Amino acid sequence: MLKTVFRILINLLSRVFKTDNISLKFPVSIKAIIIDDNRVLCLKNERDEWDFPGGKIKINEDIEDCLLREVKEETNLNIKNLKSLKPMNLKFNGVQVIVFLFSAEISCDSPIILSYEHTDYSFFLKSEIKDLNMPQYYKNIIVTLI
């Protein structure tokens, strides 16, 4: 049902804004909180912050397909057991962004190969999360998952 509602919303917004690049007008981000052995995978971005793999959804792209694509592009990993978490309405640099979060697991052993978007990666235990340079709302979610 979430997929259907999301697809309808994106289609309506693309008609209203008359653009194929809806992310310019109404940013929507999809993120995977990948858990492996009670540790969560985090990627370090260009702002030296820890983040989750993910990115922007394309027009008419299935939300789960977007997540699989973004995780593969950013980490070389395949994921499984996707579970939708509560969407978040956040502000980044004064811009409102809707973030759809999913928990996930690694589906097979593959080496992590980072894309140009990230400088480092690590798997963190629950006890290590509080000290990370990461938005507090992400920390709160991680603590409830692991």
Regions found by a protein language model. Give the residues of each.
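Acidic, metal-coordinating catalytic segment for phosphate/diphosphate chemistry
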Residues: M1-K31
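NUDIX/MutT-family hydrolases
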Residues: S103, I113-T144
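A short coil-to-beta-strand element that immediately follows conserved catalytic motifs
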Residues: N78-P87
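A structural signal for short, well-ordered beta-strand segments
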Residues: A32, S84, F102-A104
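Active-site-adjacent beta-strand/loop module that shapes the phosphate/pyrophosphate-binding cleft
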Residues: M88-P111, S122, L145
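Short loop segments at secondary-structure junctions
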Residues: D37-V40, E105-S110, K126-E128
